Amino acid sequence: MPDSAPSQPNPQPSDHKATMENSPLTEFVVQFWGVRGSIATPGTKTIRYGGNTSCVEMRLGKKRLIFDGGTGLRVLGLNLLRQMPVEAHMFFSHTHWDHIQGFPFFTPAFIPGNCFHIYGAIAPNGTTIKQRLADQMLHPNFPVPIQVMQSDLKFNDLTPGDILELDDVKIETALLNHPNTAIGYRVTWGGHTAVYCTDTEHFPDRVDDNVVHLARNADVLIYDANYTNEEYYNFKTPKVGWGHSTWQAGVEIAKAAGVKKIVMFHHDPSHDDNFLDGVEAEVQAAFANGCLAREGMSIPVI
């Protein structure tokens, strides 16, 4: 069951809090609550980068956007308990387990008076985002159904290529190259842009035009860098066809799209802090304004 309330502030690698109460309305900030791919990896070897699965928050003007609901969503939820009531727009790239497993533990969704607008694509088998989030909370997987959530949940089905307007926030979507499909999101506000592009596999012979277009001239690109080229093309255990990309492909995309800053995301569960330190050094040698995502890290878009 979800936490009823945090007994103390959840420790994070950053001092930033998920609050909009004292934020200027000119702020456009990206904050990372879960940066790991596939499965959560708590432990002493993942302290600096974090072990929670995918969850990214964007705060811009009066809007709060949440991308994916991995285990990092639980941590974000505990921070949101400090500022009720909460309204947010939640966008799911897809519904592989590491992107939805935190949703049943998202405490604010159980509290009346909160409101969450939830978006996701219809799956190839025809199921909606509502049905897939609800299904993981059915017996024998979870003790209570989604109907126990007392917040106002408003579900919206998307088709890749859709463009949404949330007042002065523009959100563009694009199809990504991932098993059972995934969606990338481009968020533009006040003339500045952040792109959430995870769970996508590059093409070996060309750049992905969908991703380049989505990332065009972005201030910040969050990109799936689950593997290194050495892992991806490994003769004995290749990862071709697994639906993920490399930091090297991310740098190629960033250069082709004119991206200002790239943040490598969706770290492989086998990559510990020391390994990721080495990857970050290589990334920065290839693209000066590049880095790896860390839990708690905040990046100003403006």
Regions found by a protein language model. Name each.
Residues 203-295:
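Cap/insert and terminal regions of metallo-dependent hydrolase folds
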Residues 37-40, 199, 227-232:
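Short regulatory "switch" loops immediately downstream of catalytic or recognition motifs
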Residues 67, 93, 198, 223-225, ...:
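Active-site flanking residues adjacent to catalytic metal/cofactor-binding acidic residues
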Residues 121, 199, 267-268:
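Short strand-loop junctions, especially beta-strand C-caps/beta-turns
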Residues 2-195, 203-206, 211-212, 277-302:
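Binuclear metal-dependent hydrolase catalytic cores
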